[in-house]
């Protein structure tokens, strides 16, 4: 009887083991099929013609496709565009297909203020081209909308750095499909933070020559009168109290301190490091990145909609640049180690939402690293930039001494707002009346009649025009959470 019970028990265990092995084998087959499907789909997929897909993977892939499409509320054309960019990214980095040789890397990304005028104008104009509707679709808005679904997967955790690295890669790929010689530039906002006193509010970064004005509706620069989805106009409110630009001390800790030597020490909800100004423990590079979002204000302060301001791309390219400095510091192996204790949507093997061919850990791979030109320093003559200067104070013998952004005291406004304020929507008794021809002087009157249709006036006048324009629009309704600043710069 005992032998019979033992035999029955053994049969039951073997049956359970066989069932478990079958389930495991089924899961392995599913995973293999999924990888084959994704590879096949990304290289060949078009939602209007699925004949290129192996039948066994249609269900696997289409479930993912429909989920993302419904989440984003995208059309077939928009989804096809996103997948075409993913396909181009995979071919560039030969992910999942070792037969494709990696393409030669494009030229290094550099600080926006060190670009030549032609290079900078080409980049900005290409961004404007992406924004323009084509066949009923704005390619810019389609890419920007992808950020909407990334809050849980790409913020407040270890995947923040890798996800945004891939997001930059996708945006740059879209730019280069329009103009092959453009490369994203980064905005090193520590150079604006270092401006003395309260002068950072007058930084040349937020003027007509670079990103456009910084208070009220963006009325000048390459992105002037930039329309947001829903019809509102792009607005900013830079340097509000309770915010801060990126602090050099934080960047230097991440880039050079030998005690900070794992990715877990710089990501949100990781080990963190003490804030160099407040001493609070647990600071992260993501925390510091949040500060600049708040400093710019407007849609940049909104987590969901921040990519609708083109400044988003220049800020995040700098975030990626500093991460790359850190990766070079800690060396091979360590820099590709995804924080093992990350969980939930930030777990190493969790899918990278929006990039169906990747897991979170893939964002840390050297495959996606980019070359960067060093940030402007006094030793490299500030990159020969007319927008930067080498400060007189500080350790003069230090070759790594940072340059500082120049300030401006005037900017450009539409000429109609100066020559005919009532025609431009301002009453004769409004504050704009103070900035008519008699106030700005004969030389300004001459400039306002230039072919550009714009006049150079004081920053106060520029702010008045831009803020009045903002007041004429209904309040901007933004969905989802806002960024919060971890540091309050007492100078602003």
Curated annotation (Swiss-Prot):
Cofactor: Cu(2+)
Protein name: Tyrosinase-like protein 1
Enzyme class, spelled out: oxidoreductase
Annotated signal peptide: 1-22
Molecular function in Gene Ontology: metal ion binding; oxidoreductase activity
Any one GO cellular component localisation term in the record: extracellular region
Any one Pfam family match given in the protein's UniProt record, by short name: Tyrosinase
InterPro entries: Di-copper_centre_dom_sf (IPR008922), Tyrosinase/Hemocyanin (IPR050316), Tyrosinase_Cu-bd (IPR002227)
Alphabetical UniProt keywords: Copper, Metal-binding, Oxidoreductase, Secreted, Signal
Source species, domain of life: Eukaryota
Entry's EC annotation: 1.14.18.-
Co-factor binding comment: Binds 2 copper ions per subunit.
Location(s) in or outside the cell: Secreted
Binding-site residues, Cu cation B: 289, 293, 316
UniProt xrefs under PANTHER family: TYROSINASE FAMILY MEMBER, TYROSINASE-LIKE PROTEIN TYR-1-RELATED
Residue ranges, compositional bias (Polar residues): 482-492
Binding site for Cu cation A: 147, 155, 164
Disordered as annotated region, ranges: 472-492
Expression sites by tissue: Prismatic layer of shell (at protein level). Expressed primarily in the mantle with highest level in the mantle edge and lower level in the mantle pallium.
